[in-house]
Amino acid sequence: MEQKQTTEPRDSPPLLVLLDPAAEQLEVSAPHTPLSPQPQSARAAPGSAVRFFCDSAREEEAGEDEPLLKKPGPMSPRAVRKGRTRLSSSSDDRENMSSGHVENGEYNVILNDPEFADIIHRAEQAIESGVFPERISQGSSGSYFVKDPKGKIIGVFKPKSEEPYGHLNPKWTKYFHKICCPCCFGRGCLVPNQGYLSEAGAYLVDEKLGLGVVPKTKAVWLVSETFNYSAIDRAKSRGKKYALEKVPKVGKKFHRIGLPPKVGSFQLFVDGYKEADYWLRKFETDPLPENTRKQLQSPFEKLVILDYVIRNTDRGNDNWLIRYDSQDDDELSEKGDSFPLKDWKEIKEPIIKIAAIDNGLAFPFKHPDEWRAYPFHWAWLPQAKVPFSQETRDLILPRISDMNFIQDLCEDLYELFKTDKGFDKDTFEKQMSVMRGQILNLTQALKDGKTPIQLVQMPRVVVERSYSGSQGRIVQMSNAFTQTFHCRKPFFSSW
């Protein structure tokens, strides 16, 4: 894509802009040099990173669709409130943005979320100073603990290219799975290699429903030597560095010298939590006091609602977390296993929290109907036999009973999912049809006072858009959607 020449040097750094869900549109303009033939505006994708390059930048990687736009300049308070920013070639850009930069000169510019901006900035500073992300040994994909300059873990980054079925997955589990058992390889109900969008989408749903069980998660771009790169990428990086060192005039023409950044989901790290399975085993041997049990029930119901709405196909008791906090005694977190459960009765007003992590295998485009059912493992817990509380019903029912709220949710997910270069609109509509069916069942279950286990036993429904119906902004179930039941069951069914 060609652009008019500007006064910026050829080695000006490209930019990454993370758009807040509240942002509606990003205006791009230069005070002296118009951008041509680039579009002058782009709709903000909730929770995703948009990459911006200065006019002199040129694409190097085949298959990358990256907008080449000018560097952001100062933002007025009014522009921030509206979720907009103007891009210019001001020399004070770095001082006027909440941003950081990685080794190759690329920047994350985060709008309307100073807390998350600071965390990303510290992560990039750490990478620059040699504190690299550490690969997590558990799991079947490449995921990394991201640290700040002091070495403290602040987030978990999961690159798209290193997902379980990604071409750069550093772990061999899925490779052997593909070779030894190809008939069961992958999950036929999921869009392949879009787990990072599923992670960010789960947080978006959690935020829209007011659940508060998913740690803040957004799609960003990061680069680190510890990520798994192909031999070609590493060789190209070494070659560019050598060219810059030996022939500076040639080296300066490259807009990227180091390794290429990777897009992926960045989830804030939660402190003090342990795997749910750890606590659940203790609850079996020594049940919680009644007040504490009720405190656990409320976030548990929110976890159920999240998983059911997004149809999480990978929810075991080892990938959601529980944190137990005592206001009177901090010894519980220090002693760990040595703290006897019988002493819990002496602790006043304990607080129990739940964190729903590992949401990368959700948003299927059809209900599981092949080999496996991918059940929710929480369905066999005692908490799943308790009817949804009035508090949960009052929180969720007013929202999901409104089809316009559901339409807004689908539109936000559309803006997020379409940022992936493999996005297919028809497949996305199928994903939303499944989600709308899940919401329809959830609405009925909450109205009838059912339990979580009764919820998952309800007939599976798909609510498809009726293109002959109303296409206006106000949506009604009767004239815009059609409801069908999905009767085919997987070979190995759990219920």
UniProtKB/Swiss-Prot annotation:
Biased composition (Basic and acidic residues): 1-11
Region (Disordered) location: 1-101
GO terms for MF: 1-phosphatidylinositol 4-kinase activity; ATP binding
Stretches for region Important for substrate binding: 163-165
Ligand binding (ATP): 143, 158, 267-270, 281-282, 358
Pfam families given in the database record: PI3_PI4_kinase (PF00454)
Keyword GTP-binding among record annotations: no
Classification via InterPro entries: Lsb6/PI4K2, PI3/4_kinase_cat_dom
Biological process terms in GO annotation: endosome organization; Golgi organization; phosphatidylinositol phosphate biosynthetic process
UniProt region (Important for interaction with membranes), positions on chain: 171-184, 274-282, 371-380
Keywords of this entry: ATP-binding, Cell membrane, Cytoplasm, Endoplasmic reticulum, Endosome, Golgi apparatus, Kinase, Lipid metabolism, Membrane, Nucleotide-binding, Transferase
Source superkingdom: Eukaryota
PROSITE patterns: PI3_4_KINASE_3
Disulphide bridges: none
Membrane topology: Peripheral membrane protein
GO terms for cellular component: cytosol; early endosome membrane; endoplasmic reticulum membrane; endosome; Golgi membrane; lysosomal membrane; plasma membrane; trans-Golgi network
Family: Belongs to the PI3/PI4-kinase family. Type II PI4K subfamily.
Entry-linked PANTHER family: PHOSPHATIDYLINOSITOL 4-KINASE TYPE 2-BETA (PTHR12865:SF6), PHOSPHATIDYLINOSITOL 4-KINASE TYPE-II (PTHR12865)
General function of this protein: Contributes to the overall PI4-kinase activity of the cell. This contribution may be especially significant in plasma membrane, endosomal and Golgi compartments. The phosphorylation of phosphatidylinositol (PI) to PI4P is the first committed step in the generation of phosphatidylinositol 4,5-bisphosphate (PIP2), a precursor of the second messenger inositol 1,4,5-trisphosphate (InsP3).
Protein name: Phosphatidylinositol 4-kinase type 2-beta
Species the sequence originates in: Xenopus laevis (African clawed frog)
